[in-house]
Amino acid sequence: MKRTKNINQETFRKEWRTHRLAPVALAVSAVFFLAGCEQTDETVSLYQNADDCSSANPSMAAQCTTAYNNALKEAEKTAPKYATKEDCVAEFGEAQCTQTPAPAQAGMAAEPQQSGGMSWMPLMAGYMMGRMMGGGAGFAQQPLFSPKTPASPANGQFVDAAGKNYGNAATGRTMTVPKTALAPKPATTSTITRGGFGETVAKQNSMQRSSASSNSSSSRSMGG
């Protein structure tokens, strides 16, 4: 009986230690999980050009210019492309479009071929600048566009090549975005029809509102 009693006491101690340590382990895991979540966002600044960036950050003039030039190159590859100037102007407004080589994989679109292998794209209206993904010392950038037509769901606002909206097209704004916002967008491989980019923006706006509403509901639930 004495041996059995000792065994039972030792088993009880082990179980007690296990139950006592479990909440601690869960708490530590939660801390690391939350820290990981916090690192998924990035603070970025939005500028219309390199001069605006340099004025706001005098010690970073070189980085501002480099980011701006890289954004211009990115815009040439990823901006929405249109077969005609009229289609581009209809979505982005007068004096907001420029001619560019037709997409590399334009498919069977006849219009670019008829205009000498050229298409039309919106001018870059600004760029987003933030730290590179992975915590590097350099900066990443993303070209931004801004429709100037009342019919556009993004009239007077900054949007990226994927149609995601970043609010008023004012220079010098700072905001928090997912790190994925700074990731390079796929190169444009075909032209779109008039109104096509506006539809993409509208869908993105709807998704952003839905996500914001979901996050708000989750916060209220967690807050009790």
From Swiss-Prot:
It comes from Pectobacterium atrosepticum (strain SCRI 1043 / ATCC BAA-672) (Erwinia carotovora subsp. atroseptica). This is UPF0441 protein ECA0329. Residues 180-224 are annotated as: Disordered. Belongs to the UPF0441 family. HAMAP family: UPF0441. Residues 204-224 have a biased composition (Low complexity).
